[in-house]
Design a protein with these regions (language model features):
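Cell-envelope/ECM-targeting effectors and their regulatory/trafficking segments
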Residues: 74-76, 105-124, 128, 137-229
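Active-site-adjacent loop/helix surface patches within enzyme catalytic domains
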Residues: 1-128
């Protein structure tokens, strides 16, 4: 993996009791230069950062050590926990808009190698805890976008992907989404959380409607993680 160090001043100590168990993937919505300038700018009132920035050519830029908190998740919730910066590693992937632009093959190959290394160092990052920004902040965020190849990552052992042929879930969809990890519908409508789920697991049709196909995908994923709504 080709990598270069570009230290950002934007980080903080991790809480003593915080185990790293979440990997959050983002897209930058900016060019590589603009992204690095922003994430390494220590003069802004609201500073942001990430542990890694991944260029389109596959070059990895290391900004913040993994044992430090980077400021990438913002208001966030996953599996009953909030403020996920404290327990996560954040990767910003250079892409101007992941709903419109494909991710280059060499970039995804480098991402898989990077993620494998992160997960190897932090085995508490189980497949269900490899998430997109849109998973942990429904409606507020949409990255890494519907063109992000989650299935390719899952085939390499990174994250989850539903299996075909599952039966539709019987039961409450909101409860099932919470069981998987999504936030409760406080301040965010259930439709927005369903849309976030579809954005990740059924990107061909993101409409916020819990139709039979969506229910089947959700039911299969719950089965994979051994959860029950």
């Amino acid at each position: 993996m080709n990598a270069v160090d570009l230290p950002s001043p934007n980080h903080a100590p991790r809480p003593a009791d915080a185990a790293i168990d979440v990997l959050v993937l983002h897209y930058t919505e900016l060019s590589l230069k603009e992204s690095l300038d922003l994430l390494c700018d220590g003069t802004r009132e609201h500073r942001v950062s990430a542990h890694y920035v991944l260029a389109e050519d596959g070059m990895v830029h290391r900004l913040v050590p993994e044992d430090r908190v980077a400021w990438h998740a913002g208001r966030s919730h996953w599996r009953g926990r909030e403020a996920l910066n404290a327990t996560s590693v954040g990767v910003e992937i250079v892409n101007l808009h992941g709903d419109r632009h494909d991710y280059p093959i060499q970039q995804i190959a480098a991402l898989i190698e990077l993620c494998r290394g992160i997960i190897g160092r932090h085995p508490a990052i189980v497949p269900r805890n490899v998430v997109g920004h849109s998973d942990i902040a429904p409606k507020r965020k949409i990255d890494p976008g519907i063109r992000f190849p989650w299935a390719t990552l899952a085939a390499s052992g990174i994250g989850l992907w539903p299996r075909p042929g599952a039966r539709p879930l019987v039961g409450d969809v909101q409860a099932a989404l919470q069981c998987l990890g999504y936030p409760p519908a406080f301040g965010v409508a259930t439709e927005d959380i369903v849309a976030a789920f579809q954005r990740r697991f059924r990107p061909a049709k993101v409409d916020g409607i819990a139709d039979p196909e969506t229910r089947a995908l959700l039911g299969d994923l719950l089965e994979q993680v051994g959860a029950q709504a």
